[in-house]
Amino acid sequence: MFEEDEEGTFLHVLITGRLKVFKTADDERQVVLYLMRDGETIGEHLIDKPGAYGYTAESISDSVILLLRLDALREIIRQNLSFCRGVNGLIFTRLQKAENRMLNYRFNRTEERVCFFLKEMVEHDSRKLVTGEREIKFLMTQAFIGDMVSVSRQQVTLVLRNMAQRKILKYNRRRLVIFRPDLL
């Protein structure tokens, strides 16, 4: 989609698909900020103050994205108060999610972080099987989960193995089925 040092000229609206939004640390590691889902936007911070995006957005599944020119959007906002309120609502929702994620990662152990992420995936990216179990539709590697919760792939493997032994979930390279979402 775009790199963090690229000049921001568009507000991106994700119609369908998934985007990983991240910053690159000094040691070239990716620090994942969030996973964008259908209907979410990115680039709103540039509406008021033009500049670089400040992060990288990368498609991790087939995606359809609507691009809105920021200069045209600024004019619409200037002329339409209710539209402005809607954009503010998007920004406030994103801020609240970021604060929750930051607090979760700051004060919780590895297993709790992984559970928090899996709960989010069950809520947004799963389907209910006839058995009542939840299958996460989005294929994820343990490294991807680790990136999302700021832990190593090895730590994710240990957590998933432990949860599988406790009959909370079953996983392999192609599927992740949650038997007991209430225990996440």
Give a label for each model feature.
Residues 1-61:
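Cyclic nucleotide-binding regulatory domains
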Residues 11-14, 65, 73, 145, ...:
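Hydrophobic packing within well-folded, soluble alpha/beta domains
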Residues 12, 34, 58, 66, ...:
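Residues that recognize and position ribonucleotide moieties
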Residues 16, 40, 71-72, 143, ...:
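Alpha-helix/helix-capping structural signal
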Residues 34-92, 96:
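Cyclic-nucleotide recognition modules
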Residues 82-148:
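Polybasic "coupling" helices that flank or enter modular domains
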Residues 123-184:
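Phosphate-/nucleic-acid-contacting segments
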